[in-house]
Amino acid sequence: MNGEHSMATPGESCAGLRVWNQTEQEPVAYHLLNLCFLRAAGSWVPPMYLWVLGPIYLLYIHRHGCCYLRMSRLFKIKMVLGFALILLYTFNAAVPLWRIHRGMPQAPELLIHPTVWLTTMSFATFLIHMERKKGVRASGLLFGYWLLCCLVPAIDTVQQASAGSFRQEPLHHLATYLCLSLVVAELVLSCLVDQPPFFSEDSKPLNPCPEAEASFPSKAMFWWASGLLWKGYRKLLGPKDLWSLERENSSEELVSQLEREWRRNFSELPGHKGHSGMGTPETEAFLQPERSQRGPLLRAIWRVFRSTFLLGTLSLVISDAFRFAVPKLLSLFLEFMGDLESSAWTGWLLAVLMFLSACLQTLFEQQYMYRVKVLQMRLRTAITGLVYRKVLVLSSGSRKSSAAGDVVNLVSVDVQRLVESILHLNGLWLLFLWIIVCFVYLWQLLGPSALTAVAVFLSLLPLNFFITKKRSFHQEEQMRQKASRARLTSSMLRTVRTIKSHGWECAFLERLLHIRGQELGALKTSAFLFSVSLVSFQVSTFLVALVVFAVHTLVAEDNAMDAEKAFVTLTVLSILNKAQAFLPFSVHCLVQARVSFDRLAAFLCLEEVDPNGMVLSPSRCSSKDRISIHNGTFAWSQESPPCLHGINLTVPQGCLLAVVGPVGAGKSSLLSALLGELLKVEGSVSIEGSVAYVPQEAWVQNTSVVENVCFRQELDLPWLQEVLEACALGSDVASFPAGVHTPVGEQGMNLSGGQKQRLSLARAVYRRAAVYLMDDPLAALDAHVSQEVFKQVIGPSGLLQGTTRILVTHTLHVLPQADQILVLANGTIAEMGSYQDLLHRNGALVGLLDGARQPAGEGEGEAHAAATSDDLGGFSGGGTPTRRPERPRPSDAAPVKGSTSEAQMEPSLDDVEVTGLTAGEDSVQYGRVKSATYLSYLRAVGTPLCTYTLFLFLCQQVASFCQGYWLSLWADDPVVDGKQMHSALRGSIFGLLGCLQAIGLFASMAAVFLGGARASCLLFRSLLWDVARSPIGFFERTPVGNLLNRFSKETDIVDVDIPDKMRTLLTYAFGLLEVGLAVSMATPLAIVAILPLMLLYAGFQSLYVATCCQLRRLESASYSSVCSHLAETFQGSQVVRAFQAQGPFTAQHDALMDENQRISFPRLVADRWLAANLELLGNGLVFVAATCAVLSKAHLSAGLAGFSVSAALQVTQTLQWVVRSWTDLENSMVAVERVQDYVHTPKEAPWRLPSSAAQPLWPCGGQIEFRDFGLRHRPELPMAVQGVSLKIHAGEKVGIVGRTGAGKSSLTWGLLRLQEATEGGIWIDGVPITDMGLHTLRSRITIIPQDPVLFPGSLRMNLDLLQENTDEGIWAALETVQLKAFVTSLPGQLQYECSGQGDDLSVGQKQLLCLARALLRKTQILILDEATASVDPGTEIQMQAALERWFAQCTVLLIAHRLRSVMNCARVLVMDEGQVAESGSPAQLLAQKGLFYRLAQESGLA
């Protein structure tokens, strides 16, 4: 470093500087280890380093710099030391000039070196100044520079001190010592961090990430994360303990960049349609895209993230350079060990160089991993955000082709697989580069014999690519089966009440397990091929070694197998082995990623809502018409036929327009067209002013009442109170434990159906919009509540008076109150006008009213104004009827935190008091995974298979050890006349051991994968059984999202991750045993270093596992919130768009994703912290093994020395991967904990009992007797039904009525044993229902619920789930419900596939299909639980006529809101507060003028 020094030590010549002018052939070691060469390299490398990287660094900080730093004491000291070094080198350059001036000749380098270092030190000092100006607090560039600068002064200091020539040249010594002191001081100061900038552009977060405050060594080693790891080791981590998210990692920043590039790329595609970009017909289901659409998305991802990826790739390339330096250094080291005359310092230097090379390889590799992991995190955030934004703009046709479960599966599985593939992208080219470099090394070692290695390797490549191709086919098959299973599971969990009511659990379990069996079959085949692929690469490595050694010893002239050839070849082959083992895994991951990427790209290309489908303009006071449609023709999608034709409609300001028509006429489609949800084929649609929308099926969010009503609007308490009172929610909210702040639960699980509908209406009213579009908001309400809500809100004197209202309704009694009535039929406007005008026309409206007329008992001359006593006389009583607060219910229709489709309102539990229960949070376990979890998994694998697997791993590892040791013996064989005597024998046994190892490796890996598949099958069956056997209360308390997480994400981990982590752990653990034995046998002294290193490893592992397991669990729970919000938005996207609330919803998604990022980032940093520190500790073992070999050189053979050091070079990676594999396995084992969460939950009664089989014809008559019956829905709630004693005769038709909360539905639940009796009991035909199995009981009773439920699958499957009827019987049932013509028109007829839950059918059509399903069951007892509440009166007449014909001899229980429905019953039960208040015929009850009479008055029947 010092320019004064000569190129050799004082008194020692450099042989005329032969380093620079060498003509004689010398050994390689001479060139690389000559002190003159090392000193020359040390003199020129630091300046070259700084002058090459410095300008690039200056440009970077100029573009990315922030506020300047204050002139701190640290900066001042750095500058003073810099100027001191400048003065020193000025002096060193001046001395030779002075001597030349005095006539003393000087070597040119004595002047050149100080001059170069003078300019370099000046540049370094300038960089210190510029870093302060640009706000750089810790410099990695200068840290590396000062570190390099220490090399030559340190060597010179040692040599000069040992030479003892201070008196001869004191000035030279002092300059060298001063130079070293100053450089070391600069190095120490560069490890410190400067003060923060004077003025910060961003406000400082509460808990900033310590990376910004860390020094360069701390950043390189990830020591800045140690505080969080120590905190996680000492206590449970909470949100406050996690670091705040940096802006560059936030969702808002990342998604906006990717979306911008995605839109730009998509708009450049030929055939792009212009609006929004997306026009793929929805019939191309995104799960199975027919053509690749990945191009635009791939280009967008590359443009956004390429800089991070390329920088990481550069780090990886540098790391690999040091990786391949190790075999070269090992070759030099073994050359040193074989040369008895070489000096000892050469061995020490080589040991240090091997250690430094291994350390630099570790540091650069971990920097690559860190950057790629951060890139993965950012990419996951960006793509998830892109999917969420796509959900907000999906067209109605696209939504029908992709259920919420598919979308959530897309985010939770496909996005994850895509981001994981980023790590393997470089494997496609870099691993091939590894292989080439390895073959070059082999050529240098073994000469032309290495060519045989190329031949062997290339001959095996086609086999491996064939295996990979076959495996990708089975992988795609598994993905298809998995998606099918996810859809069916989601549907089952959403409709579990219907399934249990009918006793269909076994049929669905059989269907689901059949799909699961096909999925596991594909998984087993894929795992088998994966094992073959790995073993084939292992065999190819062994064959390379065998053929190369055989050819070399038998053919080559210099055929002796010495230590250098043997063990350097082994080291090179170990690198080759890693490349060949990692290559199929990389290909496998990329194949998976390609499938997932295609699914993502196809989803992002689905058809969007046309922004030009409806023109929304600000309100103008002068305008008379608020809504206008001119010659409008609309379709659901590009490929479907138009559903509305020739619509011409004008709605003036302040008008109440009622839209009526038969089922399937297009009423809801008209509102969708006005909202811009339908594809506009021709015409125009315009709306003036803001819009509020009330959907037919209520959609509420998992928030409080007030947040649902305000819906991102500012809180106005007086207006909120007025809205709640008008919507008949005031008394309900007052009864809630937290008032308006009471959480409603997921999908309103704490509310009844009527409450949810009124809450949905209140949300629209609170909006104070100019235009209101309401899709049958009164259908789910009791008659008196319906009247009240209409009068207070919708009607002429309601809160919405003066606004423009379009009301789609089946409630015909409101029609006289409407300003205009529009009648739709077959997608066209049949007629439009005022109520009186349409009556006089005697057209379509009159036909509707006639269809709703009572079948009998009304004279021909009755005026149409009183066409239906219930429907049209609703306002005759005058005044607002009094009503009690409707009691909320727990619902099984909670939205799925992983998957749900259209919200379904199951039969209302109208008598459960609210208890303030919120949606259940997903369980999060803390601490280490319990040993019982491992034991349960191993029991699922099976003890014999576990023992057999361990034995196989031991056998193959013994074969591996013997193979390496046999090679060391071969290398030590004496050489006679240039040949070894036993080469053939050595080669034959070497080949035999390699074959045994390959066989054992395949058998052991196949055993692990087969055991994993067996365990996965049993655990899934157990989870499915535990959930299916749970009572209905379990589903009311457990959000479906939590269940879907177990059935999707956690099951995927058990299927794939755990077997793979188990295989990795066993491979490395047994490999560690082999390495430990090898090192201990060759150099026993190394054991002294191994033991403390093992203690340090244990300490690092304890810190890491305690924190990482917590972070993993927190991350899983937080990601559930992201999935839940995504599913919730998918269900309510039409409402969100109608309210123009896309912005707030996007912001909420970004906030949830950012919270998940706050957990993901510390977890990936903890991974790097572990890897970097453990590998550095392992690199220390390399140094110990090498130094032990140097110390034992006198009595250690070259073969044993090579065996020791080459084994030590492997232990670093092996030890690190043992810890990582164990930790990954423990993290994955959390999934086993979670799938076993429901093992100990209460289960319902047995499905089948032996006593049931003895009565196959039960019940014969259908007599039902309640004896002092009572039940409560949960232990903490009051009795919902109590003291009910009555007998219903066989064949009797009994109506059950009562106000909301009276206990009507609870009676039927008790009859079906959905809720077990708390007191008393129920007898059917004299047999207690508790003596019958649940399936026996439920299969003998038919229930038609209020809301129709269909399942994914064919129409025939939906009608005859148990396949008990012929096609003729099914067609007869369809003809009875007047659906035969409709089904005949469907493609495939009975084999027509219902999408989702029959989303492509109208509510009325679905209800008629459910009726046909009931007709086919042919049971003696029929329950209609509000079955006609959601259909128009005409459909209701059809249903009643069919029921009267098919169930004339059956016992019928009819629960009804519409009293008209029970007027033909032989007896009516009036429920009040859980008891039977009145019982008798309708005429008797009306004559008593009791509760039934009051209800009839409210309905206009009395």
From Swiss-Prot:
Q: Has the keyword Transport been applied to this entry?
A: yes
Q: Which residues are glycosylated?
A: 21
Keyword terms, alphabetized: ATP-binding, Cell membrane, Glycoprotein, Membrane, Nucleotide-binding, Phosphoprotein, Repeat, Translocase, Transmembrane, Transmembrane helix, Transport
Domain ABC transporter, which positions? 627-851, 1264-1498
Q: Where in the cell is it found?
A: Basolateral cell membrane; Cell membrane; Lateral cell membrane; Basal cell membrane
> What are its GO cellular component terms?
apical plasma membrane; basal plasma membrane; basolateral plasma membrane; extracellular region; lateral plasma membrane; membrane; plasma membrane
- Stored SUPFAM superfamilies: ABC transporter transmembrane region (SSF90123), P-loop containing nucleoside triphosphate hydrolases (SSF52540)
The PTM entry states: Glycosylated.
Q: Which reaction does it catalyse?
A: an S-substituted glutathione(in) + ATP + H2O = an S-substituted glutathione(out) + ADP + phosphate + H(+); leukotriene C4(in) + ATP + H2O = leukotriene C4(out) + ADP + phosphate + H(+)
Name of this protein: ATP-binding cassette sub-family C member 6
Which taxonomic lineage does the organism of this UniProt entry have? Answer: Eukaryota, Metazoa, Chordata, Craniata, Vertebrata
